[in-house]
């Protein structure tokens, strides 16, 4: 309906793309008027600005809010209504935010408003684990925390209790190359452990084949199947691994999920 009213070619401007841009703008507290000003003379941005404005008009007409509005409208309410802000500052005197490196601008504004009176704010995060920029996360929230809250006390949690020394040495050598980070060095009292081996493969098929064969070789030399674990980033990656395990009669169990073909 919005695209029809704004004469948008949905073959060129996909609805999902338009909604994503609008969502990103709201995460930055950029409302339709400001979005249009920022567009300048850019044809594409002006088209999106037109859609954004109509989208908001349709939302108002239907007395509706989208997910991003739940934060945007809350921030606007707290900024413009001192009595409401005072009420919630009294209600939430102590605030803790986890995974702070993944917060966006509107979330930062909300936390700042709520903590503005008593300043009892504790945030926990790791700038080296910031991976959600594509989803609107603003790394400056954690990097500039001491500037925004000058009386803050920073506690670095650099000791690792889970990993062996060699794992941390590799981790430090990798994250040291990150841009925009707070300097830190992970360390442990644990043993050095086995050296890390790095193998790269041309295809996911080759990778799964190598892993399955490696497990077979280890068990042939006396190791147990239960001595092995395979970590993967996304659930879809388990398919090829499971195929290889089944083909080579390797017993396995999916932890924290279900077998690929049972989904």
Regions picked out by a protein language model, each given a short descriptive name:
Residues 1-94, 119, 139, 195, ...:
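A basic/glycine-biased coupling hinge at the interface between accessory DNA-binding modules
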Residues 16, 90, 96-97, 101-263:
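Conserved motor-region signature of P-loop NTPase helicases/translocases
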